[in-house]
Amino acid sequence: MTGSDYNNIIIDSKESIKMSEKLVLIDGHSILNRAYHGLPDLTNSEGLHTNAVYGFLNIMFKILDEEKPDYLTVAFDVHAPTFRHRMFDAYKGTRKPMDEELRQQVPMIKEMLTAMGIKIVEKEGYEADDILGTLSVRAEKAGMDVAIISGDRDLLQLATDHVMVRIPKTKKTGTEIENYNTADVIEKYGVTPKEFIDVKALQGDTSDNIPGVPGIGEKTAGALIAKYHCIEAVHEDAENVKPPRASKNIVEYWEQALMSKELATIILDAPVDYEFSDAKLSGGVESLYTEEAFLLCKRYEFKNMLSRFNVEAPKNNAEEHFVVVRDLKTAESVFEKAKDREVAFAVVPGESLENSESDGQLSLFSEQVSNDYLAVSICFSEEDIYFICTGDEISSSFLDEKLNTLEVKSWISPDLKTNLHRFKSKEIKADDRGRYFDMMVAAYLINPLVGEYPYDAVAKDYLGLMLSSKKDYLGKLDFTQMMKEDEKKAVDCACYEVYTAWKSKPVLLQKLKEMNMLTLYRDIELPLVFVLYDMENEGIRADGIKLKEYGDKLAVSITELEKKIYEAAGEEFNINSPKQLGVILFEKLGLPNEKKTKTGYSTAADVLEKLAPEYPIVADILEYRQLTKLKSTYADGLSGYIASDGKIHTTLNQTITATGRLSSTEPNLQNIPIRIELGKLIRKVFLPEDGDLFVDSDYSQIELRVLAALSGDERMIEAFKNGQDIHRSTASLVFDTPFDEVTDLQRRNAKAVNFGIVYGISAFGLSNDLGISRKEAQGYIDSYFVKYPKIKEFLDQTVLDAKKNGYTKTMFGRIRPIPELNSSNFMQRQFGERVAMNSPIQGTAADIIKIAMIRVHDRLLDEGLKSRLILQVHDELLIETKEAEKDKVIKLLEKEMRGAVDMKVSMEVGTECGYDWYDAH
């Protein structure tokens, strides 16, 4: 029976044929290893590597679907010497150590198999191959059919008419499987399965370091065994063996050949304690898809596997207490009952708000926003979970008033800033902020690598609850649409969100306490939520007419550049097509280039920047790219974000970056270009209200000051204390040049070194940045560390601590996990070390600017000023102020920014004023 026959057996169910029972045996380490190397690296939101486990399960599920076995067992190797090592010390001696990412997944797959109730067998002193061989023989004697699943072709020796060896190949496109019984092995290799051992004895096996006979390769070994059937017969007729070298070596290395045969032979009677009843799938394959395994698949985020599990998420009693409230009397009683309790709340937005959320613009401030609620969901105990709907009796204004005036012990929100916007929160005084809890911000601090913190993820990670996600409940519909289609789904989604927020609060706070981040949460991150809410509400005025004029100006420049490029190329072509551009530059014009790849020539910026100084067409192309990006991203892109109040209300994201920095989206106002004049001019479209002006302050070299303070390097600290130009000072030290004689070029190079050190730059990176040799760049770095020795000590110690702990910390206790430090991939580890060097510096700087934002925002309110903080761009704060308040605001702004932190190095602030953002910057 061939492999194809094996897969195409047809049984007539009408015939009373008793089918043989079937045992599937899986070579655990082999399949895990094959899956690991066959799939790209995968990690879940916890940072766990999962590709090997995922691939293993995919292969196993495919086998189970095809085989539908009665028995199932997985064999694993034990990390200990076997009898083969005692026979031959160098056995498997050439194998590299297992990658750490793969090693971490061995206990994970064992946990998964155990959760599925699958029998696992290991035996010290023997390999998994010996276990598989022993069990296959026992099963065949018991009248079973056997399928052995392995990536190791050594197991082909086990194939019989009732034992099929199946070898999977894992690819991105899926899993392909080769099938071998006796006939298949003979057809493919020209020898029987048992003779396959003798082939290995002659040719050896480099993967297992089985020596074999020198000079005999796969082809010769196969031909000899096909003729003689065993190595003993080959040796007996050695004088007639061809070629002559094989004849000579089979005699000279005969003892080695015998040893190789013994090493290659799988033991069929290993002392394995095993009962078939332990591996019996009494409930069929379906019995493997247990709730425990389902939970692990959810944890590892194997979403496309979940449908296999005919189990529901673990039940909790919460859903039994979800109550929909539509009448005013009941709503009043619910809010009365909630008084003086810890209340989780979320505003379920009305239709117009939700529709605008899907169009890519910032929904909270678009023209279509209405103040209408669909509902408010609240939770204040395990039994008190309500979905209070607007309708004939309950109005949005009623709910709005309750959320703003209800006296509670504390307010809890799954996403506080979003919900403050949705019910248009009245001003919340600084003293009252501590009465609020933000689930999303707390979860972010605990694990800042995830980037998203929906209620179902928080429930899974911190409460052990497997809840359906918002997407699972609503799909592509909004709440209003789902209420019409399936009210229960909409209600369950909204209620589970507030239930999770309410239930997770003590757990998250305890976790923050254990991680020493409770102060960071209470004093910085939570107050910042309210500051960002106010800033987003304020927005920044954008002049649509000026924006169009700016776009028109760019269009003229782009057209002129196109003409220049076409003239230089001698023809018109698509400048935005890398393929066409590559042909023009490197074939038609003959510019020097790197080797052409399958996809064509590289026209990436780093490639073109090297050519630009010598070739004007390349410089024009780079400028063309800059201008077209400016036009599409800013001139054209920003106009869609101007709301009915004439302002752009960006979203300031608090829970996105791993380092703690804020980001800006919808639109991104932190990424306004500053290096080219045409890019900087975009700031001219941003204006204060008539009669007002902008005050703009930014920290001077904040990250270098933080580096000096954290490292305690006296020389750098002294330079800052003396008010020296730090880059000129560094140039003087590194290039051994008197301070007053430092050239502009030396200062520029020193500046690159200063900021490069902050980001853990290598000699290779610095050489590219400065256009110098790697040796010269390394000399700069070495000289830098000689002059600033404590910086070197600090960076080295930071990396060591990060490797030990798995994370870095800022001055204020912010943790940044760095899983890359444990990678078996050298480049990933190098990246992890650079992250470790930079994170405490960049993270501390981010903490400082956040503290400054809170201080400035609160002082403006405390002083009763009309001026407002409206924008933050990394180390820069922008205030819109009245002319009469200008002087007071400047003093206030600089004082609060300088006073944000007490370090060995003072924070210096530069301030400018102007009637548009360009002039103020």
Regions found by a protein language model. Give the residues of each.
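Conserved catalytic core of nucleic-acid polymerases
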Residues: Q481-M483, N537, H649-T650, Q654-T657, ...
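Function-dense linear segments that define catalytic or interfacial modules
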Residues: S377-E382, I446-K476, C493-T500, Q654-P738
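Conserved "right-hand" nucleotidyltransferase catalytic core of DNA-directed polymerases
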Residues: Y253-G391, W411, G434, L477-E677, ...
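Active-site palm subdomain of RNA-directed nucleic acid polymerases
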Residues: L512-I524, L528, I848, A852-V873, ...
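Extended two-metal-dependent nuclease catalytic cores across DNA- and RNA-processing enzymes
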Residues: I10, S20, P40-N44, G93-V272
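Active-site-proximal helix-loop-helix substrate-binding element of RNase H-like nuclease domains
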Residues: K172-K200, V369-E514, I524, V556, ...
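C-terminal polymerase-core module
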Residues: V556, E560-K563, E567-A619, V786-R834, ...
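Conserved RNase H-like, two-metal-ion catalytic cores of nucleic-acid enzymes
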Residues: L23-V24, G28, R34-T73, D89-A90, ...
